[in-house]
Amino acid sequence: MKKIFVFALMAVAALTANAQNIQLHYDFGRNIYPDQEPDRQKVTVTLEQFKADPWGSWYYFVDLDLTNKFFRSAYTEISREFKLGKESPFAAHIEYDGGLGRDDIRSFQHAALLGGAYNGHNEDFSKTWSVQLLYKRFFKSYDYTWAYNSFQLTGVWGLTFANKKCTFSGFIDFWRAENSKPDRYGHGMLVILTEPQFWYNFTPHFSVGSEVEISNNFIYNTYDDKTFFVNPTVALKWNF
């Protein structure tokens, strides 16, 4: 596992060289929910890139959760879209989600996604949006996980306003998961996850803002029956 984790970090380093922006988040979740989220990360570094080309677009992000000594885990989502016609708003969407941690507890279940997307924007690209309907296949990734079929509905948005000084962006995901808690083992559930971000852009390169992770059935909580969580961050962003 250590060798795989080191290899994953090397791959992340390669992605860093091509990143469009880098974000540093300080997470308050563990302060808000000390019993339900005692091991939640405090600091996350996010690398992100979107790149359009004649065929469609590439998008990826990598989240690196940090400890005071080393990386704790790395999670990535990488997607490719192929336009269905030169002027068509529809596209075929292929995606991989997954990551690795320093142990199974902090690892992520891997998944492949395939489906369609409807994309749009206004004339100056200050407003962008996307809706994706996807088949999702989870893979057995570590102990107490198993392979199963699922679906995912995703919405993505971006809005720049106030003479380009403010940016509001984010996504919302809905997908079917199977519960791994002992008393609900294998039971289907609907997971909802959204992470809106607000940025004040001091310069075209430097921004200060916040991300708020709002979820239901997403956080693995063994303390009680709580399933709904709101985890805010304070963040810095640098656009290359």
Language model features: what each stretch is:
Residues K136-S207, E213-F218, W238-F240:
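Outer-membrane beta-barrel transmembrane domain signature
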Residues L47, T76-I78, L114-G116, L153-W157, ...:
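Membrane-embedded beta-strands of outer-membrane beta-barrel proteins
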Residues K51-D53, F82-L84, G116-N122, W157-F161, ...:
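Residue-level signature of outer-membrane beta-barrel architecture
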Residues L24-F28, Y60-L64, I94-G98, V131-R137, ...:
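Transmembrane beta-barrel strands of outer-membrane/channel proteins
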Residues E37-Q41, D65-S73, L100-Q109, F139-S150, ...:
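Solvent-exposed loop/turn segments connecting transmembrane beta-strands
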Residues F228-F240:
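Outer-membrane beta-barrel "beta-signal"
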Residues W55-Y59, G85-A92, N122-W129, L159-F168, ...:
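Repeated loop/turn-to-beta-strand initiation elements of outer-membrane beta-barrel proteins
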Residues N18-T67:
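Short glycine/proline- and aromatic-enriched beta-strand/turn motifs that initiate or cap beta-hairpins
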